[in-house]
């Protein structure tokens, strides 16, 4: 796998280096015990950890945000990750204090430490940064940069955000995409740029504004053949197309979108009016009538009951589209699947995606969590760890973390000499302020290895 314009682990030899490894392992937590309810994101970073295990690995991560009930220490994450990989991980209950810096400096090759929740620091979460450059001059970055050689990131789920530990190391040291980040970028780029055809996108969920922006971006790329709208997004598209979905369902969409309603409506209207041949809409639905699932055709609308699922006839029409597709992108549930009586539509689409021979890309969030909970991750081509970041990527929105990786590639790739060395201005605290060269830090030449070499 190769990601254009980004340094990856295939380009580097990190043996003996101190590696800052930024991850997004933000996980659901049981309120009373503080135990992790899902370790999927921890498991997702294991391939990168295996690749850099001969380094001195310093893990950086966040859990939730200040003021939330699940804003906790990273201790439980550290303990669970240690169990998963079967190796000792030292937890440091701090981020960049003198104690934390001293512990990092004492590390030996093969050691792994896990720093505490980076969002405990105001400059990580309490400040709005207008550019990646502003994050580079923060205290957390300058202090950690003095004791580190390379920055590796698997924090794709936060790639649409900007903060010191996500985007601040660009010009301090080489910034490299980990295995997870590389796979996310590569798979989602394929969904946008050059997917196998025919290409079917199934877009649902309650975040209608995100889904219709993704749809419009896919259409603008000219690579998608059919877009099937399901879930609340499907309800919005039915409304836009002239079906009266009932005041209760209209109000739910208006309220959930709030200030974004008009923009989402306008985008949905453009899609419907300009590309009707590309749109697949439900032909029947299921509503909740006093706790009972009731099937309805569109001719029976309007309804004052909440629409919680697509109908069986809709699924019958969707199945051959999935079967005949060469690529399927699915983001967002088709139903209120947390209620057993209304899980049917979402589960059926999942079954279609696991049974097809097509390339299947699951777009993160609730859809990805469902794939994990049902143990079928190995039956889809790519199950994204992102939620908002996946939608931002597919919508064509700015991705500060990926921009940082690209900038670092330009900053350091161009300094690699024919001898396989990289000129590197980053200095450790105890070193003299001279331009420094790290032999073979950044190049594994084609057809050969890039030696583990000296440190300077």
Segment roles from a protein language model:
Residues 425-434, 449-456:
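Conserved small/polar residues in nucleotide/adenosyl-binding loops
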Residues 1-421:
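Active-site loop-to-helix "anion-binding N-cap" substructures in soluble metabolic enzymes
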Residues 442-445:
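Short, C-terminally biased terminal segments at protein or domain edges
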Residues 310, 425-426, 440:
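Intrinsically disordered, low-complexity regions enriched in small/polar residues
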